[in-house]
């Protein structure tokens, strides 16, 4: 999965600066940003900046394209886990346009990216963090075989000044994940 890969309903591919308008379309949705821990984008320039600094040219980060309508509907990736010093550990993160929630699309994308993380990236562990109220994200992780690891009280200062608890989930390479 160096370039792109397809699932039944999705195309996962590297992001480019030309994706800015599509990224802005879902990044300005209030429920997308707030559940992912970032301020909803207020301008196209914010999305362009995020693409340049966070997404473009990064190994393990992909745009999620819905094959039926051809739209870029989200992002997913595995990066270094800032809460762990293990060099063989990564952290799964994702965001998707709210109009595509509840269809199993993020689970489909996550399963593909996890295969990449444990195979191509040679990771031994992938973690994921979500807010306790984010039941949809927890469900994605559970369907991918993640185990609940613990509660991190007041672990994140969100963009709006709220001090947020997080729940941590973990998936080990030697434990099979659900497909």
Question: What does each model-found stretch correspond to?
Answer:
Residues 1-31, 61, 65-179:
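Acyl-donor (CoA/ACP) binding surface of acyl/acetyltransferases
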